[in-house]
């Protein structure tokens, strides 16, 4: 009984002490849903177990205006945010995000192209890919974007993203432009005309989509036999729903990254930088990609992911030979004009 009372007293003392020295949580802002859950289960819970620092997750839509408003008002509530690269570029230039040093991120040479930024480290790496229905084509499905455009060899409607970005790249790959040469070609008026000419040739066989659920529904209903799409959602449909879809990685693809960035003047700016330093360790980055079919920024992290699951990720070494990063600088400079031309073309 004495031992039991002593143990209880000790536990209460420790609880009281821990209460006095409680550590404030770091507020991390992501994209919600299964993405946030994968980060919680694969990364943040491990960080809390390792450091004792709790993580509070919030969801947003990536609006840099929200960060700007908080910083300008001197009332920052976000510590670490996942943000798309164009918004990161704007925020970094405006001083809304904290510049990162190699002490935080590690050696830049260890990152895939496009996954490390002056103010950010890749929170995920996704790809736009060619997917087809194996119930229709079996193992003899399209293996290139030229095949995607070949409606005689592969009859049926195609699902295509209703925006210039992503679609123009696919059109030029169908016309023989290699991913490595893409933005040299797209930077010329002749290259843009060439992409739209390819779209002219496929137009009657296109079913346009403007959201991922719509793209999946088009495949599910049989309205289209193949589509462009995002790799993680297709993997989810195949692995969890057992749907008959296959990604043709060898067709060529472009990948992009969302970025973790620390908000300037964040209430826990130092802790957020420490968290980002911890996250930059390959094993910690791999925690997310083991649960969600987006890749990592660190090259070494791929070695820590089981081979059967790694095959679903755009950053798998066997897939990267066919992939290139999106040129974010090109799209920041040209997106408005190209999207306007694309909308006018759609309306014809």
Where is each model-derived feature located?
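Sec/Tat signal peptide C-region and signal peptidase I cleavage site
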Residues: 5, 17-22
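Early extracytoplasmic/lumenal segment of secretory-pathway proteins
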Residues: 23-90
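Conserved C-terminal helix/tail region of periplasmic/extracytoplasmic solute-binding proteins
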Residues: 319-348
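A ligand-binding cleft/hinge motif common to bilobed small-molecule-binding domains
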Residues: 88-90, 226-243
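Periplasmic-binding protein-like
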Residues: 126, 192-201, 239-264
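Extracytoplasmic ligand-binding site segments that recognize negatively charged/polar headgroups
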Residues: 33-40, 83-214, 220
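Mature extracytoplasmic/periplasmic domains
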Residues: 254, 263-323
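Paired acidic/hydrophobic, glycine-rich loop segments that form the ligand-binding mouth/hinge
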Residues: 75-82, 208-209, 225-230, 246
């Amino acid at each position: 009984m004495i031992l039991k009372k002593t143990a209880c007293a000790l536990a209460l003392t420790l609880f009281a002490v821990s209460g006095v020295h409680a550590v404030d949580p770091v507020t991390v802002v992501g994209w919600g849903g299964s993405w946030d859950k994968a980060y919680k289960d694969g990364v943040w819970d491990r960080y809390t177990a390792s450091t004792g620092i709790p993580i509070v997750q919030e969801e947003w839509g990536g609006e840099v205006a929200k960060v700007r408003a908080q910083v300008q008002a001197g009332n920052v509530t976000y510590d670490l945010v996942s943000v798309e690269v164009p918004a990161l570029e704007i925020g970094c230039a405006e001083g809304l995000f904290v510049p990162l040093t190699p002490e935080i991120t590690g050696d830049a040479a260890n990152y895939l192209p496009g996954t490390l930024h002056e103010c950010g480290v890749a929170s995920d790496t996704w790809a736009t890919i060619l997917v087809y229905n194996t119930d229709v084509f079996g193992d003899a499905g399209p293996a290139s974007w030229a095949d995607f455009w070949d409606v005689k060899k592969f009859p049926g409607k195609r699902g295509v993203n209703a925006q210039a970005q992503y679609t123009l790249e696919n059109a030029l790959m169908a016309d023989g432009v290699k991913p490595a040469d893409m933005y040299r070609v797209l930077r010329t008026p002749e290259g843009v005309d060439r992409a739209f000419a390819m779209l002219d040739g496929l137009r009657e066989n296109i079913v346009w989509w403007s959201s991922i659920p719509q793209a999946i529904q088009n495949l599910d209903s049989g309205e289209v036999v193949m589509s462009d799409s995002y790799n993680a959602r297709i993997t989810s449909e195949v692995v969890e729903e057992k749907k008959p879809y296959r990604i043709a990685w060898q067709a060529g693809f472009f990948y992009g990254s969302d970025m973790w960035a620390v908000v300037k003047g964040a209430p826990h700016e130092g802790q957020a930088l420490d968290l980002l330093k911890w996250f930059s360790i390959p094993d910690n980055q791999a925690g997310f990609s083991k649960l969600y079919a987006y890749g990592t920024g660190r090259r070494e992290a791929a070695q820590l992911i089981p081979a059967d699951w790694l095959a679903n990720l755009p950053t798998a070494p066997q897939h990267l030979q066919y992939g290139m990063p999106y040129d974010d600088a090109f799209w920041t400079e040209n997106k408005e004009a190209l999207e306007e031309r694309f909308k006018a073309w759609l309306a014809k």
